[in-house]
Amino acid sequence: MTLEADKQTHGFQTEVKQLLQLMIHSLYSNKEIFLRELISNAADAADKLRFEALSAPSLLEEDPNLRIRVEFDKQAHTITIDDNGIGMSRDEAIAHLGTIAKSGTADFLKALSGDQRKDANLIGQFGVGFYSAFIVADHVDVYSRRAGLTAAEGVHWSSKGEGNFEVATIDKPQRGTRVVLHLKENEQHFAEGWTLRSTLKKYSDHIGLPIEMLKEHHGKEEEKDTPQEAEWEAVNKASALWTRPKNDIKDEEYQEFYKHISHDMTNPLAWSHNKVEGKLEYTSLLYVPTRAPFDLYHRNAAKGLKLYVQRVFIMDQAEQFLPLYLRFIKGVVDSADLSLNVSREILQSGPVVDSMKTALSKRALDMLEKLAKDAPEDYKTFWKNFGQVLKEGPAEDYSNREKVASLLRFASTYDTSGDPSVALTDYIARMKEGQDKLYYLTGESYAQIKDSPYLEVFRKKGIEVLLLVDRIDEWLMNYLHEFDGKSFVDIARGDLDLGNLDSEADKKAQEEIAKTKEALASRIKATLGEDVAEVRVSHRLTDSPAVLAIGEGDLGLQMRQLLEASGQKVPETKPVFEFNPSHPLIEKLDAEQDMDRFADLSRILFDQAALAAGDSLKDPANYVRRLNKLLLELSA
């Protein structure tokens, strides 16, 4: 590297300044992560070069053996990470090292918790790992040249981690990037061979290309034999983890590899490593994360597996091998049946990709099934983070609908904790004799529906009801019509029929009571008018005076709220007003001769039923007026 030319000073993007302050002043607990991040970046640079060289072999120049080298200088107090990967042009150095994509930065800064260990774990996940260099360094130099550019088009980027950075054009014969860290006075212990080797073994043993350090020679006898020329030796295994036999891989190695590909520093909950031979040949290594990424629900979030073809890296985020509802699964797939020049367009469809997607989806679901069976507490953690995403499955994946349904968890009247811990198989195992339906109720929260009037007859008969309180649940039930041959029934919808759970005598008695109350039903309907579709005697109620039932083909409250929140037009629906003929309030209403008072009481019962269902009132002021009037009459 020779004379510098065209030197310029640039100011960091505002968000980078904030990030640098965090690195310099806040992350004390796990400083060695800087090495993990810089090695990971160097490995990515090698992957990118391999991929580009498939169509442009000249990019490899005279240096086809990709590697990473780590050096240290005790006297100068420096650590150097050198790779011969893709490298950067001057413009790329300014763009990549001076700014961060706005969306990622904003989310990163919002996600910071103040907990040093948690915040340190977020660094790689948000693609800002380079700046971790400033945890241990007060000055960082980067020398780089992009593959394909001339030696005279190298770039030197330099910063002290303050408000700005310098770039200059330099001569750099070697392709790739060399990062030099000038260590802070109190961090100079990192410039030790043993420290660096042990840290590299800990975090980067799984990296699929050699990480080399100079051989160190100790003692006077060895010094005599010390070779004149520097000897480099690999300090990692340097083989793609997924290509090794499962029996040779320790759990710790699987865990570290997960952290490398996911940039998530928590251990995964489970993994599945499989080699498929026969008509199709591929190897897959799939992981279930412990926690959800910050952008799990972002439409354009990164998702998909790392794709390799015959061990050559092709692309990150190959979305085509798993359905969208399994987007949280991390891992790699290495195929022998795809061509090396495969593109995203080619991957959109085709028999090979479709077959792999089917098999990998089943593999991922099997992994979740095993987790639920063998480690229920871990599955609870999974469900808390990814349950709502998995609920997209029945709509998206018809062939695996039953399998996905078996993995779903709900709250129910069986467990008063309100935790979503009940599997559909558990529910079926507890069904009453003669019960052939799966009963459920949707609502905004467990607290809102646990004492709902809709549950009264079920509590009386000891029938368990699933309580569905996620915003997605009513939408889910539009696609999940049955499980294990048994139909789902929304207990707030239509004219409730308990089938064999009601005796013939009970049914006959209900019909006779309904006939005796036809006149009252007509009076209430005349009062409520167009606000209701129908008024009838209820078979649901034992304690409450009235309830609003949803029409068979109408949208429920959850779906209406979901559509309203997204700005869509919601079709108008009219509920069915059901009343409990044996309730004292209904008996008083039936005996009321004053039509104004009858109208006020009917309206109060209607509004209260709407509130009990979790709905809001169209005219709350009039409800309060009527209620106050009634209270005054009662207190007179």
Curated annotation (Swiss-Prot):
Record field: transmembrane: none
B: annotated span: 345-561
Listed A to Z, the keywords are: ATP-binding, Chaperone, Cytoplasm, Nucleotide-binding, Stress response
One GO CC term, this protein: cytoplasm
Any keyword Cytoplasm?
Answer: yes
Write down a Pfam family by its short name. Answer: HSP90
Localisation per UniProt entry: Cytoplasm
**Family assignment from sequence similarity:** Belongs to the heat shock protein 90 family.
Q: Quote the HAMAP family the UniProt record gives.
A: HSP90 (MF_00505)
Function of the molecule = Molecular chaperone. Has ATPase activity.
Quaternary structure and interacting proteins, as annotated: Homodimer.
Fetch the PANTHER family from UniProt: HEAT SHOCK PROTEIN 90 FAMILY MEMBER
Task: Name it.
Answer: Chaperone protein HtpG
Gene that produces this protein: htpG
